[in-house]
Every structure is written in C-alpha cells, then in structure tokens.
C-alpha cells in the first residue's frame, strides 16, 4: 500500500538525498535565509539535494543540474510520486533479503522514468557514504555501504511532488540557465568548490568536473544577471582565490561542519563564503 506522511502546511520537507556539498546546514543560518526576497522566481542552476529549495518553498522556480539522472529523479517524483515510492518499497524488501541485490541494481539500466528514479534514490541511500561517482563510461561505480534503510520515516514524496508543481526542471549548463534571469528572479548557486592553485585531492577531483575557468564564467554570468536586475546568492570555498574572484560582490564568511565523513568524530569545522549582489 502506498503511504505518505504528508507534512502540514508550513512544515519543512527535508531533502531525500544525501549529497556532497548539500546546503541543509545553510538553511539553519537565519541571517542568510532572511536575505532571500519574497515573491520572486527561484532559480537554482546547481540543484543537488535541493535543500534550499525545499526550505524556501517557492511557488515558482527554475531548477537545473548537469546530472541528468538527478533531474530525471525530480521529474519522475513530480509526475508520479506514487510509482516511485512503490518501487522504492520493493527495493527495500529485496535489499534486506539478498546481499548481492545492490550490485544487481547498480548494473541495471531501467528506461521507465519511475524505475530510473527509484534506482537512483536506492543507490544513493545504500551506497558507501552517499557518494555519487561514475566511471569514464558514465556508469555509477560506488560500492555498497553499511546502511540498509531504503525507505525513510521522513520520506514525503507527495509533498515534494506538490512543491515541484510550480517548478520547471532542466538538465544542462549553468550558464544557459543564468542567461535567462533578470528582474524578478532570485538565483541561488552552489557550484562545485574548485579553487585556484589548490592541491587538495577532493578539489583536484572536482577540477575534472568544474574547472577554474568555469568558476570565472560563473562569476561573469552572475554579475551579468545582477546587472539585469536579478538578486544573486552563491556559496563557495573560503579561499583567497574566491575572495579575489568575487571582490565586486558582498562576501560573508560562515562556519559549518564537514558532514561527508562516515565517522562523526572525524568531522571538522570549516568555513565557507556566502556571496551576494542585489540583496
């Protein structure tokens, strides 16, 4: 039986995905959240787990990500959340019965939209540390993790589907999305954190996906959108190269905990920046 613990009006729907660099922590920064203007079109070119979208609850939105499987998952929930949830429940039952089930799902390539979305969510919740990684062929290759929970008590796909009714979903380059923005738009950007001349391994991994040239292009697109009247907010690494790149923007430093470590005691406090214009 399909069952959804739908939230009452005004309650926050939490992200249903674990995502590296997710901004759920930022939604608890009241000074930052109060900067978001009301009655605007909400635009997010790097959607990820959509923490800011879910917390802000905009009635009109343009949501984009370069990850086609991610956007297809949101689209499937928007179109037919019941089918996605039913398939996720089936994954839960089979996962608990068979230790090899994870790898059979990982190697599968479903074409139907609900099945594709349920596979994406299942792998996100049961893979090692919620990591998203693909090989050169574009195949998801993260090993199974230690978590067995596929269906969560917080799952509320019905409310998510309703929230997405006012959203246009797209898959593509961030620049094409930002070019569409101007007066009456609020842009929130949470790009991969690539910095200039940094030799950290995670940053080098990101460099393959989002180069320093992309960082410069993002800055230019945001500045152009702001000149057209858009309100702009972006997050990034607290690094001298980022401060220099965004020297014509307002910059605030905020503290957070690194949450992607699988061992809580190894999670460290770090700082990031919130960059803004026209707010």
PLM region descriptions:
Residues 2-27, 32-38, 80-202, 217, ...:
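SAM-dependent nucleic-acid methyltransferase catalytic core
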Residues 37-95:
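Conserved S-adenosyl-L-methionine
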Residues 45, 64, 170-172, 189, ...:
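Short His-Asn-centered micro-motif
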Residues 46-51, 156-157, 236-240:
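Short, polar loop motifs at secondary-structure junctions
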Residues 47, 68, 176, 193, ...:
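Short, glycine/acidic-enriched loop or turn micro-motifs at the edges of active sites
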Residues 53-58, 179-181, 241-248:
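Short loop/helix-cap segments at secondary-structure boundaries that form the rim of catalytic
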Residues 122, 274-277:
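Short, well-ordered beta-strand micro-motif
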Residues 184-274:
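Conserved acidic-Pro-Pro-aromatic motif
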